[in-house]
Structures are given as structure tokens and as C-alpha cells.
Amino acid sequence: GLVGSEMCIRDRLQRDKRKPLLNRAIMGAYPPGSTFKTAQALTFLQEGIIHEDYPTFPCAHGFNYGSLHVGCHGHGSPLPLVPAIATSCNSYFCWGLFRMFSDKKYGSPQNAITVWKDHMVSQGFGYRLGTDLPGEQRGLIPNAKFYDKAYRGSWNGLTVISIAIGQGEILATPLQIANLGATIANRGHFITPHVVK
């Protein structure tokens, strides 16, 4: 066990407001933001919502639908998938999610989000990755039940549009985001992250 000065050091570290003992890579869950857009793109491609070259979606400094506006920076418009990823276009991914949640093949936004969540889970989000380090968090990928409770059953793709760009209720650990990048680099091959000794 710890004795004397070691206990003092431990106690000081535990009281430190900067939390130096918190392993943020696995214990911190944060909105992933634009790093999440590649997961969205893979989902939209697999579901046939988009293809590499079409459709192109407009971006007039953001996604605009009625009075709803999700901002974006200035770049060319309209865009297909690859330039949308390259410019991190918020509008493109909002339109993709809106199309998916409005698609009649799912029957309802509740069914669409169930399919969407299954894709996110298959890409390593919403559950622990199974690393050999203690304290790994699972993050949060909301499901229909989550939104039915939050909005009393009255929601649609526009209500939850911020999840299209990794905002809103989405939470991921830095390790989950790094794992998504590694899985893409490995051409879809998922490897459980572990510590190399």
C-alpha cells in the first residue's frame, strides 16, 4: 500500500481540479463533432441514402429547412460526398440524416433511428470497445426510446438533426473516434484496441 509522502501525493492529485488521474482517452465522453461525419457517410452509403457522386446537397452557409438553420462555413455548393467530407460540410450531413429519417422504407423516424443506431454500434460507438484498460466509458448513441421519452413521442429527423454532425446527444470517447479512423484505414477491419507491452 501507499505510505506517508506517497499518500500525500495521491491525495493532492485526487483533489486537483484538472483531474490528472482521469484517463480522458477512455473515461471521457464528449460530442465528437465533425470527426463523426465519416461514420455518418458510411451509414448513408450502406443504406443507399447517398452514393459517392450523387446526390449533391446545397449549402448556403448551412442547412436550412423552414426556420431551422444549422450553420456551416463558406465553401463551394452543391457538394457530393467526397468534397463534403473534405470541407466538413454540415449541410451535407444534415441533408443525409434528414433524408434517411424521412425515407418511407423505414416507416417512421423511430424505425430509421433504430437502423441508424445499429450502424453506429457496428462502427464502435455506444458500447465499450473492450480495451484492456479499466474504466472505459461507452459514450452515448441515442435510440428511439431515448427521443420518445425526451419529446413525448413527437419528434422527427429535424428535431434531432444535430446528431448528423456529431452534436446534440451524441457522446464518444477519444478512443472510439481513433478506432473509427483506424477501422477506415484498415478498410473496414475492426481491431479491439489494446495496450502493447
Spans of features found by a protein language model:
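Beta-lactam-recognizing serine transpeptidase/beta-lactamase-like catalytic domain environment
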Residues: 5-6, 10-35, 39-197
